[in-house]
């Protein structure tokens, strides 16, 4: 295994064979910074379902409250008109979707939304903007939003695209807790989904965030037509970031009419659960977030995801421009499963 100057890890070989012995599996639970290659992650995904979930649950219980789930709320502070060509995204200007462009929200709008989220039990408030990256004129408003969210006693997170030099430091000085910038998929499958920015661009922004002292929120999307090996490649890339992200959102593709990925063959729900389990095993201390796609998931599938190690969700009826389960449905599910918010 080797790593390029750009940060993409060459993770095709394994020194330990396809699957470690059972004793190695157990001893490996406490090894926070093991190196994971694609073959080892794929071997995890290939395990019998009960064995995989059992292993993930052991890891989860060692590092986390098994019945605690963080509630986060995500809003769009600038909607539509994005110049990128991400094949899953209804906010791309080149696709004909029902998303209406919206200028930047005011700080007052964000304060009202954050206060409502806190009243509903959210502890983290995330703000997303549809653009390639923030211009300097945008940063003043974003910094004010971050400070306002922090003043309410919430964790603040932003997802603003690619950052220029110095912008991460501005966000850190404002008190930003987390910056989200997903890898989306494996390096090998990436070109099938996005062509307007490359993998190295994403890694460069993550490096800027780390150097500024901000926690990293980084995950991906599954169900985009990728192979199991590509899912293993995504997890391996995330797990081999140094250090791995503090927060790992695993999104299920939400198919939106008008985007290139609309009509993609649906992913087996158990394959999604397997991906959650692999994320938990390979990144034991991270918060693994069950993210987009929950509205379409049966409660039983979500329950399996929590069993597999998910311990964070987006809470509220909307994620940027796509739907999310209603708060009352989530509360009822938590009651049925004996879960509590953290």
Swiss-Prot record:
Its EC number is 2.8.1.6. GO terms for biological process: biotin biosynthetic process. InterPro entries: Aldolase_TIM, BATS_dom, Biotin_synth/BioAB, Biotin_synthase, Elp3/MiaA/NifB-like_rSAM, rSAM. It catalyses: (4R,5S)-dethiobiotin + (sulfur carrier)-SH + 2 reduced [2Fe-2S]-[ferredoxin] + 2 S-adenosyl-L-methionine = (sulfur carrier)-H + biotin + 2 5'-deoxyadenosine + 2 L-methionine + 2 oxidized [2Fe-2S]-[ferredoxin]. Its cofactor is [4Fe-4S] cluster; [2Fe-2S] cluster. The keyword Isomerase does not apply. SUPFAM superfamilies: Radical SAM enzymes. Residues 67-294 form the Radical SAM core domain. [4Fe-4S] cluster binds at residues 82, 86, 89. Keywords: 2Fe-2S, 4Fe-4S, Biotin biosynthesis, Iron, Iron-sulfur, Metal-binding, S-adenosyl-L-methionine, Transferase. Pathway: Cofactor biosynthesis; biotin biosynthesis; biotin from 7,8-diaminononanoate: step 2/2. The keyword S-adenosyl-L-methionine applies. It is an enzyme of class 2 (transferase). One of its GO terms (molecular function) is iron ion binding. Binds 1 [4Fe-4S] cluster. The cluster is coordinated with 3 cysteines and an exchangeable S-adenosyl-L-methionine. [2Fe-2S] cluster binds at residues 126, 157, 217, 289. Homodimer. Belongs to the radical SAM superfamily. Biotin synthase family. Catalyzes the conversion of dethiobiotin (DTB) to biotin by the insertion of a sulfur atom into dethiobiotin via a radical-based mechanism. This is Biotin synthase.
